[in-house]
Amino acid sequence: MEVAAKLSGARISAQKARLVADQIRGKKVGEALNLLAFSSKKAAEILKKVLESAVANAEHNEGADVDDLKVSTVFVNEGRSLKRIMPRAKGRADRIVKRSCHITVKVADK
């Protein structure tokens, strides 16, 4: 049994979120939550919420035991980019790209 939780449009770049996602892939849920709780990255807090949602989905919808769950799949895809302009000297302007991502976490029992 595999249960998923998704977050669309998280306001962090996919590249930064993947750094944290790679650390929890394949680990037991308790170990992954502990790792995310003590990480200082912004992506860790976002991924922790998505992982907790996936665990709650597994408990509520499938009646799964939390101790048996592990993080089977984590992937981060690029979301919509917001393009902004930063004024510079002498009438010039630079483009600022504010990136977002879509995060999917799947948990499964062994």
Swiss-Prot record:
GO terms for molecular function: rRNA binding; structural constituent of ribosome. SUPFAM superfamilies: Ribosomal protein L22. It comes from the Bacteria. GO terms for cellular component: cytosolic large ribosomal subunit. Pfam families: Ribosomal_L22. Transmembrane segments: none annotated. PANTHER family: CHLOROPLAST 50S RIBOSOMAL PROTEIN L22-RELATED, LARGE RIBOSOMAL SUBUNIT PROTEIN UL22M. Part of the 50S ribosomal subunit. This protein binds specifically to 23S rRNA; its binding is stimulated by other ribosomal proteins, e.g. L4, L17, and L20. It is important during the early stages of 50S assembly. It makes multiple contacts with different domains of the 23S rRNA in the assembled 50S subunit and ribosome. The globular domain of the protein is located near the polypeptide exit tunnel on the outside of the subunit, while an extended beta-hairpin is found that lines the wall of the exit tunnel in the center of the 70S ribosome. This is Large ribosomal subunit protein uL22. It comes from Pseudomonas syringae pv. tomato (strain ATCC BAA-871 / DC3000). The gene is rplV.
